[in-house]
């Protein structure tokens, strides 16, 4: 069983006071079963660059550029042709406007047969997608 982590799960790991249930859940899963999307890395970059505290921003830049790639080495999933195709089919199946990044994450999870792990389970109501909320 493998998992695609949403941005809020990855970000939780570097919070000053992370949610204990999330950390406990992550500790129980082998690292090789955890995946992230390049979209998550982009969302994290956006958040870091918007931080007003220069020292915190620099610390998190190092984490994003060094620690995070090491944690997910070989498990950062791109958005390529196959994901774009799965995304288009998913949007047609859903038949309603949906957020682009969330729906691309859903398509990525479905394409790779991963469970999506997020705090925002309600944002990922897509056919066939299994969603896990470790926040409890």
Label each PLM-derived region with a short phrase.
Residues 1, 106, 110-136:
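Acidic, PIN/NYN-like endoribonuclease modules and their adjacent C-terminal/linker elements
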Residues 1-36, 49-66:
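Short, well-structured N-terminal submotif of metal-dependent ribonuclease cores
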Residues 6-7, 22, 44, 87, ...:
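Generic structural signal for small/hydrophobic residues in well-ordered secondary structure
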Residues 8, 21, 85, 103-104, ...:
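Active-site phosphate/pyrophosphate-handling residues
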Residues 9-10, 40, 83, 105, ...:
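Alpha-helix capping/helix-boundary segments
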Residues 10-11, 42-45, 125, 132:
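Nucleotide phosphate-binding site architecture
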Residues 14, 26, 48, 91, ...:
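Short, flexible helix/strand-to-coil boundary loops that buttress conserved ligand/catalytic motifs
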Residues 46-52, 70-119:
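Active-site neighborhoods of divalent-metal-dependent phosphate/nucleic-acid chemistry enzymes
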